[in-house]
């Protein structure tokens, strides 16, 4: 049979912001932003985090603003 070769079934990721009722993403909330940045300092994509497109755009802007204000590093440690 040419199908799935056994393994884990894919689980649908849920948007963190929608499920927790967060409507505004503040660039000064560094603890929240760090959850969506890799250890190398790169912004994690939607397919990894499960964030909706609307909040991914807001998240990207907030992370870039936080980097500009030196609240987040451009590269990881």
Swiss-Prot record:
GO terms for molecular function: small ribosomal subunit rRNA binding; structural constituent of ribosome. InterPro entries: Ribosomal_bS18, Ribosomal_bS18_CS, Ribosomal_bS18_sf. Disulfide bonds: none annotated. Keywords: Ribonucleoprotein, Ribosomal protein, RNA-binding, rRNA-binding. GO terms for biological process: translation. GO terms for cellular component: cytosolic small ribosomal subunit. It comes from the Bacteria. Belongs to the bacterial ribosomal protein bS18 family. Part of the 30S ribosomal subunit. Forms a tight heterodimer with protein bS6. Binds as a heterodimer with protein bS6 to the central domain of the 16S rRNA, where it helps stabilize the platform of the 30S subunit. This is Small ribosomal subunit protein bS18. It comes from Bacillus anthracis.
